[in-house]
Each structure stands twice: as C-alpha cells, then as structure tokens.
A protein has these predicted regions:
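Active-site neighborhood of HAD-like aspartate-dependent phosphohydrolases
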Residues: 1-41
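Alpha-helical substrate-recognition element adjacent to the catalytic core
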Residues: 27-59, 67
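Hydrophobic alpha-helical core bundles mediating ligand binding, dimerization, or RNAP-core interactions
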Residues: 20, 24, 28, 48-52, ...
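Substrate-recognition "cap/lid" segment bordering the active-site pocket of phosphatases
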Residues: 90-91, 114, 118-169, 173-177
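Short, acidic loop-to-helix structural element flanking the phosphoryl-transfer center
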Residues: 83-113
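Metal-dependent phosphoesterase signature
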Residues: 34, 58-95
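Helix N-cap/coil-helix junction residues
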Residues: 33-35, 61, 129, 160-161
C-alpha cells in the first residue's frame, strides 16, 4: 500500500502549458529563434534554465549569451509567464483533482508537489490547493532536473517517505522518465 503521492503540476493539476508556450515563443521571437509547438514539446516538464539551454541550442545561439545574459533571459521568460498566470483561479484545477486530494487527505496519505516549476507555491495558492500539500519540493534544491529523478526523491524525503512508498503522477515524457 502506498503512503504518499507525488504530483507534478503542469498538465496534472492544471494546464499552464499554453502560458509557458506563449512566454517561450515571445522570448524566442525577441532573440530571433522561432519556436513552434512541436519544439515546445521538448520543454515540457523541464526546468526553466534547461529549457532555455534547449531553446538556444535549437536556434544555434548557445554561445551568444554570457551567463549573466542567460540568467536575464530566463528571468524575462518567467516574468512573461507570471504576468500571464495572474488570471489562474480554482476554476482552472482539472476535474477530479480536488476530490482526489480530499480523498488522499481523508485516508492519511501524504501529498507532495514534485514540479520543475519554481512557481508551484504561487500556482497552488492561486488555485486554493496549498493546504492539501504536506510538502512542496523546491526545484532549486536539486542538482538535476527531469528526466533525472531528483525532484521526486526530494519530494518523498520531504514527506518522510521512501520512494517505494510513493506513487508519482506525471504527464510529460521527462517526468515519466524521472519516476
């Protein structure tokens, strides 16, 4: 019997993928790297910095930006994304998720967020779900992003369980590989 559930966020609890796509596309347009939906699939479930690395490689511009400029680009993308997600509300929670969280709570199952999104706490708060989570694994504290299992291992640790005692819920290829 499992004792914990480790949730991804985007594509599992709500869908902010379109906001990510639009923010990456806007940044890509600004730096001369066209971004289409097909390429965007590679960015799902991947950290912001790793996504930017993929985008720059896609545009053959990985050597054109200093570390400082790279970090500024990552921040700019996130600023676009944050502006777009201000409109998220509890109505944006996928059907069945709230009921699942309530059932898990009622059965004393620990719940953690294992998302590459550094905006996870903000999004959970906007949707009114933060009180259901025992822990939110901070992606800044892991050495490797998905598809490495680091974020799921940290989430399990933060709820005091071994990975074998947990179920991971994911939608992206990188996240499924991480589980």
């Amino acid at each position: 019997m499992f004792k914990g559930v480790l949730f991804d966020l985007d594509g599992v609890i709500t869908d902010t993928a379109e906001f990510h796509y639009r923010a990456w596309k806007k940044l890509g347009d600004e730096i001369g790297i066209p971004l289409d939906r097909s390429f965007n699939e590679q960015l799902k479930g991947v950290s912001r910095e790793d996504s930017l690395t993929l985008l720059l490689a896609h545009g053959k511009k990985e050597e054109q930006f200093s570390k400082t400029e790279f970090l500024e680009l990552a921040k700019r993308k996130n600023d676009y994304y944050l502006e777009m997600i201000q409109s998220i509300t509890p109505k944006d929670v996928f059907p069945g998720i709230l009921e699942l969280l309530k059932d898990l709570r009622a059965n004393n199952i620990k719940i953690a967020l294992a998302s590459a999104s550094k905006n996870g706490p903000f999004l959970l708060a906007k949707m009114g779900l933060e009180s259901y989570f025992d822990a939110i694994a901070d992606p800044a504290k892991v050495a490797n992003g998905k598809p490495a299992p680091d974020i799921f291992l940290l989430a399990a640790k933060e709820i005091g369980l071994t990975p074998r005692d947990c179920i991971g819920i994911e939608d992206a290829k990188a996240g499924i590989a991480a589980i």
